[in-house]
Amino acid sequence: MGNRLLVFGVLLIIGIVLSVVWMFFAPRHVMYMSLLLYRQGDADRYLEELDSLSSRLFFNKKLRTLMAIDANLIKGDKEQLNKLFERAAAYKLSSSDRVLVLQKELLFRIAQEENEKAVESYDAIHKAYDKLTDKQKEKYTEIIKEVEYPYTIHVMRDGKYASELMERGDTITDPVPAGVCYLRAAQSYCLKDDQDRAERALNHAAKKLKDTTYFQEIQKLIQTKNYKGVLKYKI
């Protein structure tokens, strides 16, 4: 009996030590990995780290699968993304996590011009959204909007959000998100065959995106008056 109590006591001490270590190192590890991917854009190093022993200790297999999605989106690894989305679909996730995963899958399907799968993802994300609490729905409203715009433009081929996107671009202070709104507005006006407003939206987009890789291409579209060329951007 005494030996059992001693063993239990030792295990309890080890458990406490491990929990303290985990609480100290896990947040630091998450921060380090976030810097790798979202600040440095080093998707390969991030994925190597995600497969390391420390990551396997801190994150379970399901979480590592979900964490790998963003890195592979940056890499543009279509084959790997198809596998990851298939695995994610089989996992039991909260409705909020399901919305986040489906948002990424929907944007991926749109970029790949896989319209049938995009429709499936769109329907699924709304079903997951409907299961959220009212408070959660408020939090995820912007996420739904962010998939609604490209879905309407590239899958439905409808320019109905043109004016709304221009207004959003006017109110957003961060230049890149504002530029994306103007770019989407230009796409929407092209779908409405409104060349004048498409040109105006493209000029606004160029000003906001002057420090990005889009700038030169947008300028070329404006100079050649090839406004419908903006529809190639699946953003």
Language-model segments: which ranges?
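Long, non-transmembrane cytosolic or organellar matrix-exposed soluble domains/tails
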Residues: 165-235
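Alpha-helical repeat scaffolds
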Residues: 44-53, 78-90, 114-132, 157-172, ...
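N-terminal topogenic membrane-targeting module
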Residues: 22-102, 112-115, 121
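Boundary/linker segments of alpha-helical solenoid repeat arrays
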Residues: 58-62, 93-100, 128-139, 173-179, ...
